[in-house]
């Protein structure tokens, strides 16, 4: 073992062709002779050429291709230079020799491998102790000099894959003569000390840099290992890494025990190494220097002599350090208010989960207790604790966490983190005020103060640097999430989850879901999707607050969805008022609500959600308002009993989906609120979002979910695993219910299924659907409509975007309506099953809206009545539209959603065309049944909330036309006041929709007048009102589309593939059009092309919407080629309207041409009537739309809206009336939408709608975004600042995407609104094409947009590719990606996004184009990144696209996430 006997070798390193020094290694040839021989021979190059690589077996000229700060630097790939090559001197790989030596210190030389016994030539040099690598990698040497070179390399900037940007090469290498060994040893003695010192300094610098780079590294690390979770928190990491890592270094042994042990270990190690290296003589020299360096580092400060001293210094340094973070022991330092919050987030998570159980405990007491809990976690347990908390919340969180954790606990981590972060954010904000904040809060406060709005999401991050890392990593890596989740994920993440949940819960109800609810909600597919949408919306309004609730809500989506609904709703209100408290409640409620979504539904939920939401987040599970919802949920569950087994399955799926959505929401919120963080998060968030998206994709539900998620604002991340789960579950749902994911989509598409399911368990699907809807809706409602405006309606239409908004109200109404629906659905369920299958594609969208209303019942009624109502009920619809608009409260909206869907074909169209008429009738029924509820719900929603709601609804509307209807219904209350004439307009819209076949012109004239009156009436909610108007338009169109969709879907069930031709023929019919779209994507492409002239002209406006829907539908049903064609068309231009339109138009074009066209015209007319306001909004909205377009490249809807604007502008030039509208709108759009222009061109038809919608939505979008995110009013200083921040942030994540997204933020909101509406249509399509589903989601990601967009884009793109491969999945993912960003940005954006998404769904390129338009570089970047991530996360995401595929994708997503993270 003589050190002298140990061989030494050297590397001469150059960085960017500048020599920086020599690294000397000593190899433990006495311990690992074979490994050492391999290394030595590779240094000397004496072995000639490799057998497998054919290259010279020598390290000379090789690079250090992977550099992870505070972890290691890796090289030795002499053949490929990227980590994929290299071979040993023995040929290929050789076995792991032994694991005697441990990675217990820095500067050890160890073999890299690809698994067991796969040692080649690649090695790595640790820069921190890495005990997690023990038993995995063979340590065979150590560095005896050149530590500064290693540190220099370690500190190089790296890309997302940890590749240093600089060229780090071994210019020379060789084996040293044994004689120099003594000198080397001498050097070694000094250098080890120096090494130690270097290590220390490296650590210190590393520690400080660790905050930023450590985030990346830890994100990666997390991706790689969950072990790093403890380190994941920056503060902990800094302290802990500085302390622990450095301690291990000091020790050189793995013992991170007392300093005495450490020093002893160090001494032993030193002695050992010196003995090994040389003689024990080195001991004294080596030992003292180490302490000195450490002394500076503070960690091992006294290591030199006093081992206790280090502790004292540690403590003292810790105290100073601790002010920013936790003490090394993990103990929260009271002195620092920052970390104080650290625990509460977890405690918040705990609180959220535990509070549910122990709501009686006073918040401050709980916080203290949780703080104690956090105490342990601060070190690294925090996340674990969080996990535990999550698990404790298992009833809510557990489904989330178990599902998430078990499924993809990266989801849980992410979701947890996001949810917690969000909840934390809101809670923290509240607590900051209370000053009961924990460490996290202190940090958060700092960060929050800086980016309070922006960092709400980041709050998670700030709350814990680790958390932030965690968050970032969450977004960045599934491992991140996982680790986050694992370590402190649930705790911190939980707290974060709450924060994120608030933001992302809404944004990613799934994120909150993330843990488990996320999955559930999303899994519930519609639940998630809706939850997500809602969540996002809520997220926007009270992004964080909702997110949080959503997190829980989504988490619980299965059971919680219901709870989620009411909490969301409440959360929405609270979100604005008490984001923090509401979130937990919301989460809890979401969880519980999911269970009883149906029974609790509309009537009670409006009250309960408010009640639920109002209870502080502290009320967690035990909330009383919550309990009524929960009881109702249980009632729903009773009804859902048949579905319960499925629901259980869905629970997982939903949880996944929810997780995904939550992730998304969180991401989106984070995105909005934390562009910067989100840039970091963006990756993770995006990933999550993709996850979410995946989930969304997984089922249309996912799309919706995402839309909601997106609406909610944060998109992000952690969605992947849940997606896997959700997908798994959703596959269940999809199959069972068109997959839970499908559940959402499936809710639409599965509306038949849903009817079946509802029949199976009227409560279950309702529960699930409604839960999802609730989740989404509630999120949306919570954030936007805390009041639970037409939750049902919103849930349906807004399912994606609005669902979040109207989650509560929808939940309530959904529950009530679900109950009624369930009954009706039971009656008509069978009819609907057949119908629904047809509807599935179209009806998916339709169903979403309808489902959201009385999902089952309404849908069945809608479907049954659809035809009747279509002819006979149109007047009714008109009236109901009016009453919807007037009441537009939850009950009315629930009912109205039908009526509104009828009124607003856009809105209901997505749900299903059949719903248009059916919905009228059902609407009548439900309106009769729930007018009070809706009214009350709507009424309960104050104008402020109304503004929120409006915004969110708009966003929702953007996101899904079905959402549009909901949005408008939801807006009903605010809109009632503001949209008094808008309601009339919508009634007229409904009439017109009915009359559309009779006369477009009449409608056009009618609509514009009313629109004008309404448009200006609600200046309060500038964006909101416009969004509402857009919702009107979209609702009308969507209603029609959904009617058609539903009818078509029914047909589709019967004539799935036969209908391709048949439906094209039927395309003359509204029903056929939608189904044909969905079914006949191939046919559609042809049909689009063939029908394009006719449909294009007449249906241009509708075509936009329909195109999006069709694109979405096409994507799922259509082949990738078709999608590509559509997308290309979309990308192409206004022609996208043409092809895309043709897509929707071809089926819908003939029959629907009149109606949708009129709808569009109406929308446009309304917009035209409000040209000034609309233009103003449109400018914003267009900006948003553009950004959305860019963001919304995924956001087909958004892009489509912009595109629709563009396309309709262009196409509608033919349609002069529309063109005028568009011209007014489009001009701002062109100005603002320069970025969006290409995207808009891509989705021109959709964009027109979005434009029309966006103008209304835009302010709303902005507001929603801002509100959801930061509760900043558009135009306010904060808004401006935030925009700037987002702009800065977005470019960071995705230069183009970010930039575009920032402007797009408003646009995104508006875009999202239409997009959402569209998304709904899309979602239907998406149901078929999970891809479409994703589209929606992405809308939500607007905040996340900047980074998220890059990620979302990437994901979406990857998915788009995937989608191509699996058109649905990828497209969906792609779209979702965008949607996420977009949604995050703003619901409106979601809408825009959705069209884009749709477009994107059609063609990856369309989205890409949009994205490119928005951020071509971002897109490319994103795209590549997304590609990688997509592979990682989009894989899942892709899988999210297909319900069935989605499920497996969902699983993929988990891995994907992991992959992505790693």
From Swiss-Prot:
Bias (Basic residues) occurs at 221-240, 329-345, 423-459, 543-568, 754-774, 988-1013, 1377-1388, 1425-1435
InterPro entries, alphabetized: Cyclophilin-like_dom_sf, Cyclophilin-type_PPIase_CS, Cyclophilin-type_PPIase_dom
Composition bias, Low complexity: 198-213, 524-542, 699-725, 736-749, 801-815, 1331-1351, 1359-1376, 1389-1410
Q: Name one Pfam family in it.
A: Pro_isomerase
Composition bias, kind Acidic residues: at what positions?
910-922, 1022-1031
Q: Which GO terms describe its cellular component?
A: cytoplasm; nucleus; plasma membrane
Give the Polar residues compositional bias ranges. Answer: 403-421, 932-969
SUPFAM superfamilies in UniProt: Cyclophilin-like (SSF50891)
Compositionally skewed regions (Basic and acidic residues) per UniProt: 241-250, 258-286, 382-402, 497-507, 775-800, 823-870, 885-909, 1032-1072
Where is the PPIase cyclophilin-type domain positioned along the sequence? 10-175
Q: Identify residues that carry Phosphothreonine.
A: 1155
Asked if the keyword Repeat belongs to this entry, the reply reads yes
Question: Acyltransferase: present as a keyword of the record?
Answer: no
Question: Renumbered to this chain, where is the cross-link Glycyl lysine isopeptide (Lys-Gly) (interchain with G-Cter in SUMO2)?
Answer: 323, 578, 581, 639, 656, 666, 1057, 1163, 1177, 1216, 1225, 1258
Q: Where in the cell is it found?
A: Cell membrane
Q: Which UniProt keywords apply?
A: Cell membrane, Isomerase, Isopeptide bond, Membrane, Phosphoprotein, Repeat, Rotamase, Ubl conjugation
Taking the first listed entry, what is the main subcellular location of this protein, grouped into a coarse class?
Answer: membrane
Q: Where Phosphoserine occurs along the chain?
A: 379, 401, 416, 463, 471, 613, 648, 866, 887, 889, 891, 907, 1077, 1146, 1203
The family database entries (PROSITE patterns) matched by this protein are listed as: CSA_PPIASE_1 (PS00170), CSA_PPIASE_2 (PS50072)
Its GO biological process annotations read: protein folding
Name the segments for region: Disordered.
Answer: 187-591, 607-627, 658-1072, 1129-1156, 1169-1215, 1251-1462
What the record says about activity regulation is: Inhibited by cyclosporin A (CsA).
GO MF annotation terms: cyclosporin A binding; peptidyl-prolyl cis-trans isomerase activity
What EC number(s) would the UniProt record show?
5.2.1.8
Record function comment: PPIase that catalyzes the cis-trans isomerization of proline imidic peptide bonds in oligopeptides and may therefore assist protein folding. Component of a putative tumor-recognition complex involved in the function of NK cells.
Name of protein? NK-tumor recognition protein
The protein's organism comes out as: Homo sapiens
Chain's gene name: NKTR
């Amino acid at each position: 073992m003589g050190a002298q006997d140990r061989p030494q070798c050297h590397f001469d390193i150059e960085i960017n062709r500048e020599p920086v020094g020599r690294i000397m290694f000593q190899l433990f040839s006495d311990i690992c002779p074979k490994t050492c021989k391999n290394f030595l021979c590779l240094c000397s190059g004496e072995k000639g050429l490799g057998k497998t690589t054919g290259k010279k077996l020598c390290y000379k000229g090789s690079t250090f291709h992977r550099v992870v700060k505070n972890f290691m630097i890796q090289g030795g790939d002499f053949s490929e230079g990227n980590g994929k090559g290299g071979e040993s001197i023995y040929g290929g790989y050789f076995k792991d020799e032994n694991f005697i030596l441990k990675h217990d210190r820095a500067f050890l030389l160890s073999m890299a491998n690809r698994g067991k016994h796969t040692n080649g030539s690649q090695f790595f040099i640790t820069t921190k102790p890495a005990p997690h690598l023990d038993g995995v990698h063979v340590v065979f040497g150590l560095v005896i000099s050149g530590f500064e070179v290693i540190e220099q390399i370690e500190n190089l900037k790296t890309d997302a894959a940890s590749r240093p940007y600089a060229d780090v090469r071994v210019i020379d290498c060789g084996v040293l003569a044994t004689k120099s060994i003594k000198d080397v040893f001498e050097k070694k003695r000094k250098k080890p000390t120096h090494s130690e010192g270097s290590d220390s300094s490296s650590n210190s610098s590393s520690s400080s840099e660790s905050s930023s780079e450590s985030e990346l590294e830890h994100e990666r690390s997390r991706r790689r290992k969950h072990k790093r979770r403890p380190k994941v928190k920056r503060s902990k990491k800094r302290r802990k890494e500085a302390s622990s890592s450095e301690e291990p270094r000091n020790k050189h042994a793995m013992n991170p025990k007392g300093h005495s042990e450490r020093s002893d270990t160090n001494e032993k190690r030193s002695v050992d190494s010196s003995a090994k290296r040389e003689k024990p003589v080195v001991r004294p020299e080596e030992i003292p220097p180490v302490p000195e360096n450490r002394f500076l580092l503070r960690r091992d400060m006294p290591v030199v002599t006093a081992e206790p001293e280090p502790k004292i210094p540690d403590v003292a340094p810790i105290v100073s350090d601790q002010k920013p973070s936790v003490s090394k022991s993990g103990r929260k330092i009271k002195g620092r208010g920052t970390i104080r919050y650290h625990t509460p987030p977890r405690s918040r998570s705990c609180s959220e989960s535990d509070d549910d159980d122990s709501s009686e405990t006073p918040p401050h007491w709980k916080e203290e207790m949780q703080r104690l809990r956090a105490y342990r976690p601060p070190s690294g347990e925090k996340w674990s604790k969080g996990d535990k908390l999550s698990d404790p919340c298992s009833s809510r969180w557990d489904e989330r966490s178990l599902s998430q954790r078990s499924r993809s606990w990266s989801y849980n981590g992410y979701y947890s983190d996001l949810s917690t972060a969000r909840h934390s954010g809101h809670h923290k904000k509240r607590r900051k005020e209370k000053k009961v904040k924990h460490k996290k809060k202190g940090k958060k406060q700092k960060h929050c103060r800086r980016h309070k709005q922006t960092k709400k999401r980041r709050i998670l991050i700030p709350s814990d640097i680790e958390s932030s890392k965690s968050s970032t990593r969450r977004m960045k890596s599934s491992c991140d999430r996982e680790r986050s989740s694992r370590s402190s994920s649930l705790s911190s993440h939980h707290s974060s989850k709450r924060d994120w949940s608030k933001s992302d819960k809404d944004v990613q109800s799934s994120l909150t879901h993330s843990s488990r609810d996320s999955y559930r909600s999303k899994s519930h597919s519609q639940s998630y999707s809706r939850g997500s949408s809602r969540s996002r919306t809520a997220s926007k309004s009270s992004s964080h607050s909702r997110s949080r609730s959503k997190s829980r809500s989504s988490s619980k989506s299965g059971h919680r969805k219901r709870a989620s609904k009411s909490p969301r709703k409440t959360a929405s209100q609270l979100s604005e008022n008490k984001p923090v408290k509401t979130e937990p409640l919301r989460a809890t409620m979401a969880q519980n609500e999911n269970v009883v979504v149906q029974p609790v539904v509309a009537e009670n939920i409006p009250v309960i959600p408010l009640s639920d939401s109002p209870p502080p987040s502290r009320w967690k599970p035990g909330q009383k308002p919550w309990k009524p919802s929960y009881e109702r949920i249980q009632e729903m569950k009773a009804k859902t009993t048949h579905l319960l087994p499925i629901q259980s399955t869905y629970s997982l799926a939903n949880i996944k989906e929810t997780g995904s959505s939550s992730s998304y929401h969180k991401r989106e919120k984070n995105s909005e609120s934390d562009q910067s963080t989100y840039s970091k998060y963006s990756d993770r968030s995006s990933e999550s979002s993709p996850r979410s998206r995946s989930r969304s994709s997984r089922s249309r539900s996912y799309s919706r979910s995402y839309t909601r998620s997106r609406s909610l604002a944060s998109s992000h991340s952690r969605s992947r695993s849940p997606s896997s789960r959700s997908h798994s579950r959703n596959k269940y749902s999809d199959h069972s219910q068109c997959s839970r994911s499908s559940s959402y989509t499936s809710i639409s598409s599965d509306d038949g299924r849903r009817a079946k399911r509802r029949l199976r368990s009227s409560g279950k699907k309702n529960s699930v659907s409604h839960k999802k809807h609730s989740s989404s809706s509630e999120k949306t409602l919570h954030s936007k409509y805390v009041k639970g405006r037409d939750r049902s309606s919103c849930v349906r239409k807004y399912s994606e975007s609005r669902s979040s908004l109207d989650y509560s109200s929808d939940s309530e109404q959904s529950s009530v309506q679900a109950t009624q629906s369930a009954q009706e659905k039971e009656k008509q369920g069978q009819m609907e099953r057949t119908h629904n299958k047809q509807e599935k594609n179209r009806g998916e969208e339709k169903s979403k809206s309808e489902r959201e209303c009385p999902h089952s019942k309404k849908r069945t009624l809608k479907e049954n009545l659809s035809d009747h109502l279509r002819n006979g009920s149109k007047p009714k619809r008109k009236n109901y539209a009016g009453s919807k608009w007037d009441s537009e409260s939850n009950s009315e909206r629930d009912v109205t959603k039908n009526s509104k869907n009828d009124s607003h074909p856009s809105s209901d169209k997505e749900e299903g065309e059949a719903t248009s008429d059916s919905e009228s009738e059902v609407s009548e029924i439900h309106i009769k049944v729930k007018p009070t509820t809706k009214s009350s719900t709507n009424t309960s929603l104050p104008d402020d909330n109304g503004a929120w709601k409006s915004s969110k609804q708009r966003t929702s509307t953007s996101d899904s036309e079905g959402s549009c209807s909901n949005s408008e219904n939801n807006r009903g209350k605010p809109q009632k006041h503001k949209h008094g004439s808008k309601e009339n307009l919508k009634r007229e819209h409904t009439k017109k929709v009915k009359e559309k076949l009779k006369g477009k012109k009449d409608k056009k004239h009618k609509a514009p007048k009313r629109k004008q009156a309404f448009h200006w009436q609600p200046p309060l909610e500038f964006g909101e009102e416009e969004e509402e108007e857009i919702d009107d338009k979209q609702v009308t169109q969507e209603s029609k589309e959904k009617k058609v969709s539903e009818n078509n879907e029914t047909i589709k069930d019967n004539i799935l593939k036969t209908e391709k031709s048949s439906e094209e023929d039927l395309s003359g019919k509204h029903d056929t059009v939608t189904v044909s779209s969905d079914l006949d994507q191939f046919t559609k492409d042809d049909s689009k092309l063939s029908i394009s002239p006719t449909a294009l002209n007449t249906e241009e406006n509708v075509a936009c919407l329909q195109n999006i829907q069709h694109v979405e539908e096409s994507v799922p049903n259509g082949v990738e080629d078709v999608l590509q064609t559509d997308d290309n068309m979309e990308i192409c231009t206004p022609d996208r309207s043409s092809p895309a339109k043709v897509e929707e138009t071809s089926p819908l074009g003939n029959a629907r041409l009149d109606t949708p066209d009129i709808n569009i015209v109406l929308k446009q007319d309304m917009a035209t009537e409000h040209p000034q306001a609309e233009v103003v909004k449109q400018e914003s909205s267009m900006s948003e739309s553009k950004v959305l377009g860019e963001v919304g490249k995924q956001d087909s809807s958004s892009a489509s809206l912009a595109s629709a604007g563009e396309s309709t502008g262009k196409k509608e030039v033919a349609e002069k009336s529309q063109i005028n509208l568009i011209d007014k709108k489009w001009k701002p759009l062109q100005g603002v939408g320069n970025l969006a222009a290409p995207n808009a061109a891509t989705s021109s038809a959709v964009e027109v709608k979005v434009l029309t919608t966006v103008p209304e939505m835009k302010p709303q979008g902005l507001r929603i975004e801002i509100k959801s995110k930061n509760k900043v009013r558009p135009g306010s200083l904060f808004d401006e600042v935030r925009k700037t921040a987002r702009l800065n942030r977005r470019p960071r994540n995705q230069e183009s995407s970010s930039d575009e997204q920032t402007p797009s933020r408003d646009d995104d909101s508006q875009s999202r609104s239409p997009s959402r509406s569209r998304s709904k249509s899309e979602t239907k399509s998406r149901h078929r094409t999970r891809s479409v589903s994703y589209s929606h989601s992405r809308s939500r990601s607007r905040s996340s947009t900047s980074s998220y967009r890059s990620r979302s884009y990437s994901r979406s793109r990857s998915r788009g590719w995937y989608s191509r491969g699996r058109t649905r999945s990828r497209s969906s993912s792609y779209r979702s990606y965008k949607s996420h960003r977009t949604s995050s940005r703003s619901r409106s954006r979601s809408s825009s996004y959705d069209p884009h998404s749709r477009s994107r769904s059609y063609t990856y390129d369309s989205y890409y184009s949009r994205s490119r338009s928005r951020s071509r570089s971002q897109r490319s970047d994103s795209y590549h990144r997304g590609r990688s991530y997509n592979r990682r996360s989009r894989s899942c995401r892709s899988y999210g696209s297909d319900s069935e595929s989605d499920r497996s994708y969902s699983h993929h997503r988990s891995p994907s996430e992991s992959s992505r993270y790693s």
